[in-house]
């Protein structure tokens, strides 16, 4: 993987990731394909939204169908028929999400499978082995996602464990002679001093890119923006910066303003299935009865398949009847909206007009623009 920084506007960065499987223009949003599919979408439909890279979930694919089945097809790209690059998370966040079903030890994590209740063990080495078999273009280190809230002592202990696991992930990755990219994950909760220690430790080990983890886990939005403003500028300029699990459209905008290059989140797909649709003028709740006879499209500025062919009344009707097509059309639109937003941000950075773009974005959705402390 090669990262090229093309130009900047304030802290925002316009760049390009180049892989053997193709290039990714940044800032980029990665749709989430947890089980080897972006829910309800064919790979061709995902591609048509403008997505250039997907996220796959190591934890879930390991438990079902298992790496052996996927490897028999070649790798995850072959299994799901996606031609572009794939980033896989390491499984750390999913283990964190299990709560009391898991025990964290120095060697790794013991937990009960959410599928059949059997005891399972996951370690940095096992995570690297799984991701190697998946053929991930970007491999994520295995880490512990520090919960929120956490005391200073708890955050320190968790962050130090993640650093030791980062070294073990790097060692196994190098043993494999894996030709793909390996990203480190900065932890440290909402404490600046621990974010510094984490980043210093990771840069000493050396990675192809750096993710910011442990945000969007329940902390106030102000804390997320504060940590981003603090740590993002300290990440090596020649490496991509990835904000994990974020987020709403305004979170993407604020992340870009603070120098983030990559994002992923289930929000556009999950919200689509629940009838929450993102548009240039804010969120439309398609289940609201006011849309029952509305013959307009979702978004007059959107050229996605859904907006070119269907009305709000039809989408309301499909949702009311529980038709699968409704969820699919909603998903096509939301993913297209996210990609259109990212394209707009990229073009604004290129033109040196990011803040003008951001002003218009907030005016249209009817929200106040957050202050940026630069």
UniProtKB/Swiss-Prot annotation:
Catalytic activity: 7-aminomethyl-7-carbaguanine + guanosine(34) in tRNA = 7-aminomethyl-7-carbaguanosine(34) in tRNA + guanine
Pathway: tRNA modification; tRNA-queuosine biosynthesis
Keyword tRNA processing: yes
Co-factor(s): Zn(2+)
Record EC number: 2.4.2.29
UniProt-annotated catalytic positions: 89 (proton acceptor), 264 (nucleophile)
Signal peptide: none
UniProt GO MF annotations: metal ion binding; tRNA-guanosine(34) queuine transglycosylase activity
Source organism superkingdom: Bacteria
Cofactor note: Binds 1 zinc ion per subunit.
Residues at which Zn(2+) binds: 302, 304, 307, 333
Binding site for substrate: 89-93, 143, 187, 214
CC annotations in GO: cytosol
One of the protein's GO biological processes: queuosine biosynthetic process
Keywords from the UniProt entry: Glycosyltransferase, Metal-binding, Queuosine biosynthesis, Transferase, tRNA processing, Zinc
SUPFAM superfamilies: tRNA-guanine transglycosylase
Keyword match Ligase: no
Residue numbers spanned by region RNA binding: 245-251, 269-273
Protein family (similarity comment): Belongs to the queuine tRNA-ribosyltransferase family.
Assembly notes: Homodimer. Within each dimer, one monomer is responsible for RNA recognition and catalysis, while the other monomer binds to the replacement base PreQ1.
This protein's name: Queuine tRNA-ribosyltransferase
Organism for this UniProt entry: Psychromonas ingrahamii (strain DSM 17664 / CCUG 51855 / 37)
Organism classification: Bacteria, Pseudomonadati, Pseudomonadota, Gammaproteobacteria, Alteromonadales
């Amino acid at each position: 993987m090669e990262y090229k920084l093309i130009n900047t506007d304030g802290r925002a960065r316009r760049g390009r990731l180049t892989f053997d499987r193709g290039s990714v223009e940044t800032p980029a949003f990665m749709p989430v394909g947890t089980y080897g599919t972006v829910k309800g979408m064919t790979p061709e439909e995902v591609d048509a939204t403008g997505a250039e890279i997907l996220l796959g979930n190591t934890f879930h694919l390991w438990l079902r169908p298992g790496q052996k089945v996927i490897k028999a097809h070649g790798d995850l790209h072959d299994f799901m028929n996606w031609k572009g690059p794939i980033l896989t998370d390491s499984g750390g966040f999913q283990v964190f999400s299990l709560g009391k079903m898991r025990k964290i030890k120095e060697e790794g994590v013991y937990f009960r499978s959410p599928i059949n209740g059997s005891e399972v063990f996951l370690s940095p080495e096992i995570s690297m082995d799984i991701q190697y078999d998946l053929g991930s273009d970007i491999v994520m280190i295995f880490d512990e996602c520090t919960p929120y809230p956490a005391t200073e002592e708890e955050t320190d202990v968790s962050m130090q464990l993640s650093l030791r696991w980062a070294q073990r992930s790097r060692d196994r990755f190098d043993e494999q002679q894996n030709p793909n990219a390996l990203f480190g994950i900065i932890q440290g909760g909402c404490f600046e001093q621990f974010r510094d220690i984490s980043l210093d430790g990771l840069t000493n080990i050396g990675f192809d890119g750096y993710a910011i983890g442990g945000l969007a886990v329940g902390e106030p939005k102000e804390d997320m923006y504060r940590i981003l403003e603090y740590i993002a500028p300290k990440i090596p300029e020649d490496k991509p910066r990835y904000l994990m699990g974020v987020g709403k459209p305004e979170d993407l905008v604020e992340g870009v303003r603070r120098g983030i290059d990559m994002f992923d989140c289930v929000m556009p797909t999950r919200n689509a299935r629940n009838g929450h649709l993102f548009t240039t003028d804010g969120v439309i709740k398609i289940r609201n009865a006011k849309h029952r006879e509305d013959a307009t499209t979702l978004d007059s500025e959107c050229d996605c398949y859904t907006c070119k062919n269907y009305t709000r009344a039809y989408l309301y009707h499909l949702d009311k009847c529980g038709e699968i097509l409704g969820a699919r059309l909603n998903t096509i639109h939301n993913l297209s909206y996210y990609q259109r937003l990212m394209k707009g941000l990229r073009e604004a950075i290129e033109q040196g007009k990011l803040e003008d773009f951001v002003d218009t974005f907030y005016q249209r959705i009817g929200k106040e623009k957050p202050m940026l402390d630069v």
